C-alpha cells in the first residue's frame, strides 16, 4: 500500500502485529499490550465480541511521521497550518459511507470490544472515542472517556471545556444535546479532536483541512438522522444524546496513572449504532 493510500483507521491498524488468540475485553487487551511492550497490535479474536476487532497503540507520532514522510517538526507545522486554514468536509450520501454498512437491530454497546483496562476502573470504558456535538450552528469534536453503564447508557467525564459548555447550555434550555460517538476515525480526525482551543472552533473543519493537506483528498462525512455529521470511513458511528441526567462516573486510572475520583457526570443515551463490516 502506497503512503497516499493509507487513509482510514483500518489502513493503519492492519499494519500492526496481529493477535489471533482469544483475548478478553476484561483486562486481557491491556495485559497483552504490556506483554508486547505496548507496540501496535490488532486483536482479531475478542472473546466477548465475535465479529468485532480491537486495536491498541496504533497512531503514535513515530508511526504517523513514517507513513506521512514527515519529521516530528513538520508534523507539528502541518497541524498548525490546518488550525489556521480550516475548510469544510465533503458531505456524501449515507449509502456511500463505510460506517453505514451495518446498523445494530437492537442497540447494545456491550457487544462491541470496549475494554476494562485496569482493575481499579469502575468497569468498561470507551477512552479513545470522539464525541461530535452540534447545536445552534456550532460544532465541537473532542475526546471524552465514557463509562459503559448499560446496553444503551454511558456516563461521560466532561471536563470544563467546550462540550461541557454545549451541555450546560442545552440543559439551561431544557433540551437534550444531539451527539455522535465515533470510534476508529482516520488520524486526521483524531489529531484534530485532540487539539485544544480557547475559542469554540469547529475541529471537524480543522480535520478536513489536515486531511486535504496530508492526502490531497477531501474528508468525507455523512449527516446522521439527528443532524450530526460524522466521518464516512469511521469504524463505528453511534447516534446519541446527552441527557439532562447525571450518574456516577469513576474511579478510573487516567493517563498519568492516577486513580481519578468518583463524580456525578452527564448520562449519554445511545439510539443507534452503525459500523463497518468486521469493525475495529
Task: List each language-model region with its residue ranges.
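Extended, highly charged
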Residues: 1-252, 257-267, 271-280
